[in-house]
Amino acid sequence: MIFYSTTAPGLEDVAAEELKELGCRIKEERKGKGRVFFEAEIEDIPKLNCFSRCSERIVLLLGRFKVEKLEDVYKAVKSIDFSFIKPEQSFAIRANRVGEHGFTSIDIAREAGQAVIDRYKEDFGVRLRVNLDEPDVIIRCDLVDDDFVVGVDTTGDEALHKRNYRIYQHPAPLNPTIASSLVRLSGWSHNYSLLDPMCGSGTILIEAGMIAKNIPVCKFRENYAYKKLFKLPEPEWEEKDVELKLYGMEKFKKHVEGARKIAEYVGIPVTYIQGDARKLDEYFDSIDFIVTNPPYGLRIARKGIIEDLYSKFLESASKVLEKKLVMITAEKNIARHYAEKFFEIKEERNVMYGGLNCSVFVLE
């Protein structure tokens, strides 16, 4: 069976590598488009939803088409066999559109929905119910330029980044799928120390700890869309007993306290410090890996504050870092200038995150 996963555009190769480790056969990475197509079995769906840390959702592909006009959407969807939907089940279309088109995502959803209803009625004499709020079956219709993919969402309306462990809400939390991707890009493993010097509520450290201890993302979540479609056994897993050297630093006391609550809830031992990321050498003699998401996207009037933070952070990091530093930021020019001054830039990649064109830097 062919599936596709969605991820942050720019991190497709990271998601693909993880999917390979889960036993999938990669068919295509749509670089810059946030899609990875792969082969897997229906029986793999629970495992993929439980252990895909770098993907947003897992979708079972029903069809892939070239679409130029809105009428093409109706024709494409109507050509699909929807016999897997039971007559008593409801459905909803979730449409997404990227590129230049003479129609909207709402138009796609309307045409696709009508096509599903018409095809099912022709085949079975039953008009399927539409339920936009709590559908039994979610059909994804994603149009990227002229590439139209239709699939059954096995994850649900809540994407996989909804880990449900955030018992403390930071005002600007990092998406956990991106956090996991950054950890993977760093090459960190539990044998080494890891520091996030601007940790917020600790997402990067929690994700690193869950990877090291083999804690699945489904530990804190039960509602997956596939459970209304397939009767599949839950994946078996065993938590690893590993020693971790995880350190988080945060400027504000309330965030430190919140991060500690989350770490305790998940069961990840993290040492949190209230401190200044511009003075890392005052807190640490050496750190193997640094992975962080520093502040960015602030008003022009505050660029001076950002430049001071980035310059002093990277300078102090250069005094304690043993291996690699990975950071994501929308402040590309400032980050690049000081990264080149204090490190060697091993990689810079564009990543779309939260509507911002960001860069991920890998430094040594």
Annotated model-derived regions:
Residues 1-135:
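Non-catalytic nucleic-acid substrate-recognition regions in nucleic-acid-modifying enzymes
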Residues 1-25, 29-36, 40-44, 79, ...:
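Class I S-adenosyl-L-methionine-dependent methyltransferase catalytic core
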